[in-house]
Structure formats: structure tokens, C-alpha cells
Amino acid sequence: MKAFTEPLLSLAGFEEMTKTAEKSSGLISVTGCIDAQKSQMIYAFGGHRKNKLIVTFGEQKAKELYDEYSFFDKEVVYYPSKDVLFYQSDIRGNLLTAERIRALKAIREQERVTLVTTFDALMNTCLLYTSDAADE
């Protein structure tokens, strides 16, 4: 994968962005790169980080980013948003529910994980899992 990340490391803008991110904690927002380069940029920028959350504006864009980013990182999962229309959820069956469960399971069980989702899905409420509930 160094063939994809090495060219970025030599760019002054990328180096400055990396230094700024290391000094600060919390959210990192990067804008201005073209769609074809986003997955490569995310991988090079956050490759050393244990967990990554990639949030985008729409369902289609999240799926595209998931497909592209899975080339770089095998520990990537996609968390879809809920269907607003009953018609859409009826067509897909339990696929969205299964994808959500798979993503939540990966977050809970894997040491390293990258989650790709949308703003809508990020705002979904989930029940809190505690180990006490499993004992009952």
C-alpha cells in the first residue's frame, strides 16, 4: 500500500494537515479533494489510527466510499441509515437491519475498525448494551 501513500507524504499540504491533526484532538474535517482521491487520502491520513469514522452526506456516497475504501482497509464496515419510506424497507427486507447489526458487532468486537456512514445514520438512536443485561 506504500505505492498509494508515499506520493501523498511528500506533499507539503498533506504534511501540514498531518501535523495539525496530531496537535489537536477530536474531529478532523478535510475538504477540497476530488472524489477519486478521497479513499486514498483517508487511508494515508488515518492509516495509523486505531478507529476511524467516515461520515458523508448521502447513502449513495457512503456506499461508494465504503466500496473504494475496502480496497485499502479490510476492517471497514458500512452502517446504513434507516429507510424513511415503508416501501423501500419492504423491498430490501432485512438487509439493512443485518448490515447495521454487522457494523455494531464489528465496533464492539474488533480492535481496529473503520465505520462508513451518513449523517442520518449517525443520528439514529440505539439501545445501550451492557454486560449486565446479558446475564439475565
PLM-predicted stretches and their roles:
Residues 1-131:
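ASCE RecA-like P-loop NTPase motor cores
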Residues 132-136:
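A short, hydrophobic C-terminal helix/tail in secreted or cell-surface proteins
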